[in-house]
Design a protein with these regions (language model features):
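Hydrophobic ligand-binding cavity/cleft-lining segments
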Residues: 1-40, 45
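Beta-strand/loop substructures that line and gate deep hydrophobic ligand-binding cavities in soluble
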Residues: 80-133, 149-151
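Glycine-rich portal/gate segments that line the openings of hydrophobic small-molecule binding cavities
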Residues: 37-87, 97-100, 133-151
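Residue-level detector of alpha-helix boundaries and kinks
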Residues: 1, 11, 52, 77, ...
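Hydrophobic pocket/interface hotspot
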Residues: 16-20, 26, 50, 67, ...
Length: 151
C-alpha cells in the first residue's frame, strides 16, 4: 500500500529540512511513532539507524529504520530493516520564501494484523489520517517563530 501527501509551509527549505531530519523531532509531528531511539554511532544523515515503535491499528510494532537516502535540503528517505515493512520519507522544494514538503510512504502490513477487508480499510484510513495530521502538525511547528526565525 502507498500514499503521498504534500503541504506548503512558510519556512525556508534549509530550516524545514533540518527540523525533519533531526530524529529527536520526529515524535513531535509523526503521531504514529510512539518511540524512537538511535542504534548507530551516526545519528544524522547517511548511516543513521533507529529502533522505533509504530502504532498501527491497535498494535504497537517495533521496527528498525535506516536512513536510505539523504540529500541535504531535498530528500530524506527511510527504509525498515525489520518489523513493519516500510519505505518512505520527505521531499523538499523551495517555493519563494517557503517550502513544499511531500511525504510519501509505501508499506506492507504484517501477517495477522489484517483479518478482514474491514481491518485493512481501517488501517489504511489510520495511516492516511496520520499522514495528513502529521503534515498539519509539521506546518504548525515550522511556521512557529521558534523555528522559522531561528538563525
Amino acid at each position: 500500500m502507498q500514499f503521498k501527501r504534500s503541504i506548503v509551509v512558510s519556512c525556508p527549505v534549509d530550516k524545514a529540512f533540518d527540523y525533519v531530519s533531526d530524529w529527536q523531532n520526529l515524535k513531535s509531528f509523526l503521531s504514529n511513532i510512539l518511540d524512537i531511539t538511535p542504534i548507530s554511532f551516526v545519528q544524522y544523515g547517511p548511516g543513521a539507524a533507529f529502533d522505533t515503535v509504530f502504532k498501527v491499528g491497535g498494535a504497537n510494532i517495533p521496527t528498525t529504520l535506516d536512513v536510505q537516502e539523504f540529500v541535504r535540503d531535498q530528500r530524506l528517505i527511510l527504509r525498515s530493516r525489520h518489523g513493519l515493512k516500510v519505505i518512505g520519507g520527505w521531499e523538499f522544494k523551495p517555493i519563494g520564501s517557503g517550502t513544499s514538503i511531500t511525504f510519501s510512504l509505501q508499506y506492507d502490513l504484517p501477517p495477522g494484523l489484517v483479518r478482514t477487508a474491514k481491518d485493512k480499510e481501517l488501517i489504511e484510513k489510520d495511516f492516511s489520517d496520520a499522514a495528513s495530521q502529521s503534515l498539519q502538525l509539521l506546518k504548525w511547528v515550522l511556521e512557529s517563530p521558534t523555528i522559522r526565525d531561528r538563525e
